[in-house]
């Protein structure tokens, strides 16, 4: 999805919105469709795998918003949008797409799963009514949001059409989680992840290589991150590389000389340690593995555990030949 910002306005609730020209490129549609509308509150983020999905914002910002590495929603006050506004947005998107099929919908912003279950049910029901052709509805969630939902709540959401939750795990190491102010311990993350999957909902987790920098105990971060991946055994697991942005606590620590940022080859070595430390006997289901985000120094993809030897060989080759992606941008 390519976004071109034109100008700003205020909606009836006084919230800042942006007019955006978006070229929606769908494999099911020939060509690109230029559309002008003001349905999004920016910044707007989505997982890479949702590139061809319709994005519907049901929250703004992130309810946690304290992670020391994250710059995504620092300028946004967290709110849950009124159901009337959400339904109006869904109607507007239907009018824009007209008879073109919408098979995938992603619910944003950063912690949309925290929306009360009864409201989410209304959203999912309305999506089914307005976009009956939709085959997948996915959502960002936090551990806190999952904790607040009962298994019965999650099963109800699954029955209503919620098929995938994206969860930022970041690390399997308690010291690392404390360092980034994630607000949870690894054991609880595993428990909550299994809770999601027990309801029938697929889980996609993200981890971060280079999180602790050069001189922190990054070895335990890597080893315990390998452990949490195998302990959870989600359908999808992705490893991103840490990129620091102005306005985050980690960036400030780096500027003060209190944090030594890890880059390039050192990050690849940590990714190799994560993969080589996995106890494959604990993997209870095939895991679709990706490290192909714009932040990654090396694009990797495969299935765990079967492709671990090949993935390690690809990392070794990149290290030996210094064949890394030095792109410093993070497009989501």
Model-found features: residue ranges?
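Hydrophobic faces of well-ordered beta-strands that scaffold small-molecule active sites
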Residues: 54, 105, 137-139, 165-167, ...
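Auxiliary Fe-S-binding modules of radical SAM enzymes
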Residues: 21-50, 227-332
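Conserved SAM/AdoMet-binding glycine-rich loop
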Residues: 95-202
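Active-site beta-loop-alpha junctions enriched in small/polar residues
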Residues: 75, 110-112, 140-144, 170-172, ...
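Conserved strand-turn element in the central/C-terminal portion of the radical SAM core barrel
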Residues: 144, 172-176, 196-221, 240-246, ...
């Amino acid at each position: 999805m390519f976004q071109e910002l034109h100008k700003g306005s205020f909606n009836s609730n006084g919230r800042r919105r942006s007019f955006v020209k978006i070229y929606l490129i769908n494999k099911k549609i020939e060509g690109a469709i230029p559309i002008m509308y003001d349905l999004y509150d920016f910044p707007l983020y989505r997982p890479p795998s949702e590139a061809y999905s319709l994005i519907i914002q049901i929250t703004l910002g992130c309810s946690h918003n304290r992670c020391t590495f994250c710059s995504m929603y620092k300028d946004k006050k967290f709110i849950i949008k009124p159901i009337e506004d959400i339904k109006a947005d869904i109607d507007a998107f239907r009018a824009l797409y007209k008879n073109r099929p919408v098979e995938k919908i992603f619910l944003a912003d950063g912690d949309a799963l925290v929306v009360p279950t009864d409201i989410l049910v209304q959203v999912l029901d309305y999506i089914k009514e307005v976009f009956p052709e939709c085959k997948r509805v996915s959502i960002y969630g936090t551990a806190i949001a999952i904790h607040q939902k009962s298994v019965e709540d999650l099963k109800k959401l699954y029955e209503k059409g919620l098929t995938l939750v994206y969860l930022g795990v970041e690390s399997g190491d308690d010291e690392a989680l404390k360092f980034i102010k994630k607000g949870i311990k690894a054991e609880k993350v595993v428990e909550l992840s299994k809770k999601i999957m027990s309801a029938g909902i697929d889980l996609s987790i993200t981890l971060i290589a280079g999180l602790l920098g050069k001189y922190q105990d990054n070895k335990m971060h890597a080893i315990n991150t390998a452990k949490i991946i195998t302990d959870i055994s989600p359908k999808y697991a992705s490893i991103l590389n840490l990129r620091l942005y102005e306005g985050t606590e980690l960036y400030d620590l780096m500027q003060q000389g209190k944090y030594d940022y890890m880059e390039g080859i050192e990050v690849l070595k940590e990714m190799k340690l994560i993969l080589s430390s996995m106890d494959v006997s604990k993997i209870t289901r095939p895991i679709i593995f990706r490290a192909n985000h714009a932040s990654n120094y090396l694009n990797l993809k495969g299935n765990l555990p079967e492709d671990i030897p090949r993935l390690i060989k690809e990392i070794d080759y990149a290290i030996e030949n210094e064949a890394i992606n030095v792109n410093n941008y993070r497009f989501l």
